[in-house]
Amino acid sequence: MTEENKSFYITTPIYYPSGKLHIGHAYTTVAGDAMARYKRMQGYNVHYLTGTDEHGQKIQKKAEELNITPQAYVDNIVAGIKELWEKMNISYDDFIRTTEDRHKDVVEKIFKQLVDQGDIYLDEYEGWYSVQDETFYTEHQLVDPIMEGDKVVGGKSPDSGHDVELVREESYFFRMGKYVDRLLKFYEDNPHFIQPESRKNEMINNFIKPGLEDLAVSRTSFDWGVRVPGNPKHVIYVWVDALSNYITALGYGTANEEKYKKFWPADVHLVGKEIVRFHTIYWPIILMALDLPLPKKVFAHGWILMKDGKMSKSKGNVVDPVTLIDRYGLDALRYYLLREVPFGSDGVFTPEGFVERINFDLANDLGNLLNRTVAMIDKYFSGEIPAFKANVTEFDETLVAFAQDTLKKVEEAMENMEFSVALGSIWQLVSRTNKYIDETQPWVLAKDENDREKLASVMAHLAEVLRQTGIMLMPFLTVAPSKMFAQLGLTDEAHKSWESLSTIGCIPAGTKVEKGNPIFPRLEMEVEVEYIKEQMKSSAPKVEEKKEEEPKAEEITIDDFFKVELRVAEVLSAEPVKKADKLLKIQLDLGTEKRQVVSGIAKFYSPEDLKGKKVICVTNLKPVKLRGELSQGMILAGEENGVLSLASIDQNLPNGTKIK
């Protein structure tokens, strides 16, 4: 491939727009952006894809809660996501939305092809389903399974820890097992396909070796998605819908496949470790079935955690990237994300660590080196950078060799997606250059006219290393390098290119420096740590401190209370009552009998939410008809600020147990 037509295709996951993005989402996207910028600087024709996965049950439910259409709901959130990426200088080349016709039309074609060739078939499915993850699990995959004897009756998702429910419905299935041997052979022939290596072992041992079951690829319990061609009661599920974005965005399956032919297969899919399975098992198998090339690499990064675990609004520990950018600048955040956590491992965000990185690395090391250099050139040479000469002082050659070695380390680290290592190498060069100042002591050289040549060499070397440092930082930081070049007086773009790093001393003699403000001001540690902590707390749900006093209920005797019969009941099923927005018709198991009750909780619970719940039922109420439906009791709920919440029990008591 010639220099002019070498291509590089990198993708992030397409994000699920169910709420505001946090620093964890920014982490993936900044990493992809750094890689895209690096490859562009190396002369590659880069295509950097990101986007949003906008279909599914969660989106539909959230939209219904807000009484708006799912499309209106996702349009609003996607606008916010795009604003965030603009604020973070994310240089994506395309933003794919799964609600766009260019995507949906091709997904329909892909699904039909897979049906026509026998890879997808129609059957009935029963399995454990997590609404939060929109994923089915086998009972062997469940965490904390709930048992009744030797039978699994519930449990939690292994991915998110949310409750699962037993779902039985008609579904289309993908014959996964048909491709297992080919997939394992592909792993063997392409040992670097899954990175880090530990993820590959996890996929083989946890998912493939236990037996890869056929995969449900359609749903009938919601309708927000791409319809199955010829059977519109089915919605194409996330595996075929969302994963296909990587080729639909390139125009695959359309009249214009120019981008697809140019960029596919992808050089790297960047994904979070929680979705490795989908990208390294399901997606390769789908591509095999379509007889398409597989991506060259899937790189699974870790999570940015907090001291108390994953970010959660309920914990009050969510870090909003916008808050950090507005106060500390974009580069401070980008640097922290890429330097603090080795890509592929989990890392812990702390306010203290964030402020320390700014003060020690950015302000002290880099900022101070630039300030000292520009100030000395201004003082000793009237602001003009002297001509570069090699080996004038005994320390010059060592510094130049260190800089050249740093370039090799950075390039090697970037090829391995080791952003933290690359930045660490650059900062070693910054430290070595600060040491060079101490070794050469320009303030001493300036006192002796006979040392004028040495002093000039020191200034030229400092300016040159800062030029190289600025260039090597350009994939990672999008603001500071330009400020560095401005203070060094560099205006020729050729002197800021990656290619120019192979030429030592290319700053023209007489280039005028321009003193400026510190590119990274030092921060007051205690003040800023407290500020960040307060911002994190503000992400927690607001708690009302004071409630209005409610009217006291009329006093009753204990005998009056005992007239009410309360029993534990389990919800077997629920469905909306026709022409009644607030009512659900609920079937209950009371141990010795089944009953139907009608309850006004439809605005707060979906039928899927209720199935399997243990509730408290008033069982000796006189039966009544509500909207034509018989109600044989009442389930208890509490109300706060117009929101209902069902009363429940904290022990798994048998159905029918009397509440005393």
From Swiss-Prot:
Please state the protein's primary subcellular location: cytoplasm
One of its Pfam families is tRNA_bind
Query: How is this protein annotated for GO cellular component?
Result: cytoplasm
Residues annotated as binding ATP are: 313
Superkingdom in the source lineage: Bacteria
Keywords from the named record: Aminoacyl-tRNA synthetase, ATP-binding, Cytoplasm, Ligase, Nucleotide-binding, Protein biosynthesis, RNA-binding, tRNA-binding
The EC number(s) given in the record are 6.1.1.10
Motif 'KMSKS' region is found at 310-314
Where can the motif 'HIGH' region be found? 15-25
Gene Ontology biological-process entries: methionyl-tRNA aminoacylation
Residues covered by the tRNA-binding domain: 560-660
Where it sits in the cell: the answer is: Cytoplasm
The record's family statement is: Belongs to the class-I aminoacyl-tRNA synthetase family. MetG type 2B subfamily.
State what this protein does.
Is required not only for elongation of protein synthesis but also for the initiation of all mRNA translation through initiator tRNA(fMet) aminoacylation.
Q: How does it assemble?
A: Homodimer.
PANTHER family (alphabetical): METHIONINE--TRNA LIGASE, MITOCHONDRIAL, METHIONYL-TRNA SYNTHETASE
- Write down what this protein is called: Methionine--tRNA ligase 1
Which organism is this entry from?
A: Bacillus cereus (strain ATCC 14579 / DSM 31 / CCUG 7414 / JCM 2152 / NBRC 15305 / NCIMB 9373 / NCTC 2599 / NRRL B-3711)
Gene name of the record: metG1
